[in-house]
């Protein structure tokens, strides 16, 4: 029962990892532990993006632990000058602690909030970290986010043998199910390998014999689109694959179109290799660039029927595409990073997409007209549906009393006659 009094004594201050334990849904997806794996994986991928990692391994262990290992530089083990604890302990136990705020250590990265792995620690029964760095091997462990053992050296390794291994066991009380969604995880791992050419990712499900996979791509997006669209009819024999770079931003995309619903719909967007399921600035910029280039192409070649206007959805509805953006200091909508809110990046993507597609369309006019035809058909269908809805509203008018009801027959809208206005619902006994 709530107290009537409200004074300073009622104010609570959550410290350490308590905010995560109190409101886990604000920091991760609590439907299953997949997002915890992604948080650890993203740290390893950030090492790969910076050129310090070429191998990542993920294992689902028989005892319920999940292990993510990389051959990056290894988490810092020296003492932090201000907080007086090792770098690895600070990263695992303190929210908003990390080396990715300034951009000095990572040009492009996804772990920008300094929250990810500390959330994993907070929501795990047990977590163990092994670091190989400076010819030494170190270990530290945690229980429910609290340090269980101090960082200690446990061995020596070769100078070039570096990396970080994090093994954790998700606490089931924080999740709807503690089962990892393996299909979704594999899709994510494959996409990471595609978006970071030269990176090898190994997956091993120890709970199921023979469930092992390795992903390695040299030509990235092109291979990914070809594999993902297997079994679907495509308009273009060769997909459009492009890349643009500036000092602080990069854009890569691959796109093709299908004249009928594809077997597997591909409409994926990524920022610094993090999947943005809700799109955001980069997707909006991409759609804008596609629309502007195709509209200009159609207008120049007089392809549009009089009075018909195409929109971005008309252009992209029949498309299979993957968009990968990289930028410094991206602004995400929340910790789960499902939507990008970096407004400046939208104009970068839009202008570059338009330039690339405009050149392509005007050098591949026959294929360009096929793409335009799909957009025009979509726009015409949309216009017909809109007209039906508007006519329906016009005919509907005020609600009719008693047994009289509005006629909902398509005939009313296609070929109305004076007799087709009202239908009388008669009782079955009449």
Outline where the language-model segments fall.
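Short conserved segment of the HATPase_c
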Residues: 78-98
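Alpha-helix capping/hinge segments and adjacent helical runs
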Residues: 16-17
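Short acidic, Gly/Ser-rich segments with clustered Asp/Glu that frequently serve as metal-coordination loops
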Residues: 74
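Conserved small/polar residues in nucleotide/adenosyl-binding loops
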Residues: 413-420
